[in-house]
Amino acid sequence: YQEDNFSRYYAASIVRGREHDPFVAKGGSAEETRDTKKMEDKASKLKDFTVAEARPLPVIVMADVSGSMTVDGKIEALNLALKDMVAGFAAESRLRAEIQVGLITFGGERARVHLPLAPAHKISEVSPLRADGRTPMGAAFEEARKLIEDKDMIPSRAYRPVLVLVSDGLPTDDWEQPLDGLCKSERGQKATRFAMAIGADADVEMLRRFANDPESPVFKAHEARDIHRFFRAVTMSVTSRSRSTAPNSSAPLVLADIPEDDDLDLDF
């Protein structure tokens, strides 16, 4: 009698448990229910480990290619420095930030986009710069402003851009209003802005108005090797940001850590 009552009680408990199992109520077994829940738990955990897409970190260089850059190997040193910088960026990990590079040149009568903004690891070659003519720097500022404010080229999720200005002379066009327009634009005022004055004829005061990092004042290049050292420092600053847990924080130029190149020893 006791055994019979226990059997009936146990059977009733099982039935009640099955009635409250939504999967079993629809015709599935308890074992199938457990397997389904395990699969759902695994899928949920996989979602937690999904790797986020790297955010763009734009680097835009404005390079002087006026006629004076042909003197003393300046343009050759600049070409080599840009090539090495892009290669350095391309070798970086893209887990958090994807470094992108664009190049605007100004020389002759106009400024133009020499290298459209693109991920560094997808840039197969930077065609050599050729120097000639005047120094339309104001036009370069306007090109840079249009580029950094273009939400199709640089999406809202991008990290703050880096702007680099390199010149060996005085602007030959109207430049003050375009410079203010660039530096006061929504993204321009948040950007990290580095500047290099090449030789004794560069407009250092104008370059100071462009540069905005108190820890990285206008760098003065007195010889060809200095151009290379400056761009190595830019490379280190940007890659440091890309590896950081906070890539929107600027990293100053540290030229003390950059070795001098004995094969680039032309004085300007």
Question: Where are each of the predicted segments found?
Answer:
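Acidic, polar low-complexity linker/tail segments
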Residues: 17, 23-60, 65-76, 149-156
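Von Willebrand factor
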Residues: 52-114, 122-159, 162-166, 173-174, 192-205, ...
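Short glycine-/polar-rich loops that comprise or flank the Walker A/P-loop
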Residues: 57, 189-192, 213-216
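Arginine/glycine-rich "motif VI" loop of SF2 helicases in the C-terminal RecA-like domain
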Residues: 93-94, 183-191
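Short beta-strand-loop
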Residues: 97-127, 204-212
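Extended acidic, low-complexity intrinsically disordered regions
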Residues: 199, 224, 246-268
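Von Willebrand factor A/integrin I-like adhesion domains
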Residues: 200-249
